[in-house]
Design a protein with these regions (language model features):
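Tandem CBS (Bateman) regulatory domains
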Residues: 1-10, 49-86, 90-99, 113-114, ...
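Basic, Lys/Arg-rich alpha-helical nucleic-acid-recognition elements, primarily the DNA-binding modules
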Residues: 1-49, 56-59
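A glycine-centered beta-loop-beta connector
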Residues: 27, 35-51, 98, 106-121
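Short proline/glycine- and acidic-rich turn/helix-capping motifs at secondary-structure junctions
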Residues: 172-179, 209-215
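Short basic, glycine-rich beta-strand/loop surfaces that mediate nucleic-acid
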Residues: 179-188
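Short, charged, intrinsically disordered terminal tails
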Residues: 193, 199-215
């Protein structure tokens, strides 16, 4: 999946000379937390978050204070080193940017112009859709040797039980580099037969692992 499939293309922007008060009103009206700051050519020159606004106007939270700070221009508080993405970037690459740089939104540029934006909420919804977690079904986690063809073998056992696989995730076993964990989302509310067959074939089923499920 690529970025242009999940990005929002209607992006609220402001100029560097707009006031902090304008940003606050826009955030409240549109229920957003980030505003890209652009020039007349729609090139991103900064970004302002709700945290930047709070840090830039601490006195407005005191009853006896002046609200003159609200008239300060956004260029005084905006972040200028903006990390950006491209519409053809893979979603997992963008997720890595969020993780590595601890950001919560990413302006998307094409030919240096702003064409969209992605937030951490967008990534969360995408993860839910990719894993099928929003659909009825069951999750099965299996510890398997790290070798070629193992995914095909385990999927074959699930297939023999006429259970449709909604999604598959694969990640390393943190305790043993010779193993990996397969996480299946299957379209059945009762995975007992699948689990029993997996265990009969010698696979280590990590989840479900509860009373009533044979070992």
């Amino acid at each position: 999946m690529i970025v242009e499939e999940i990005m929002k293309t209607k992006v609220e922007t402001l100029k560097a000379d707009d006031t902090i008060e304008t940003a606050i009103k826009l955030m409240r009206e549109k229920k957003i937390k980030h505003i890209p700051i652009t020039n007349d050519a729609l090139e991103v020159i900064g970004i302002v978050s709700d945290r930047d606004v709070k840090d830039g106007t601490p006195s407005i939270f005191h009853d006896d204070s002046s609200t003159s700070e609200l008239q300060n221009p956004l260029k005084l508080i905006m972040k200028k080193d903006v990390i950006t993405g491209h519409p053809l970037d893979f979603v997992e690459e963008v997720a890595a940017l969020f993780y590595e740089h601890r950001i919560s939104c990413l302006p998307i540029l094409k030919e240096k112009k702003l064409v969209g934006i992605i937030t951490e909420t967008d990534l969360l919804y995408t993860l839910i859709q990719l894993t099928g977690a929003h659909q009825p079904g069951s999750q099965i986690e299996v510890k398997v040797p790290h070798k070629a063809g193992i995914l095909y073998e385990v999927a074959g056992i699930i297939r023999r039980n006429n259970s449709n696989i909604q999604s598959v995730l694969v990640y390393p076993d943190k305790k043993d580099e010779n193993f990996k964990i397969l996480v299946f989302r299957v379209r059945t509310m009762n995975p007992m037969n699948v689990i029993d067959d997996l265990k009969k074939e010698g696979y280590d089923v990590l989840w479900p692992n509860m009373p009533g499920i044979s070992s």
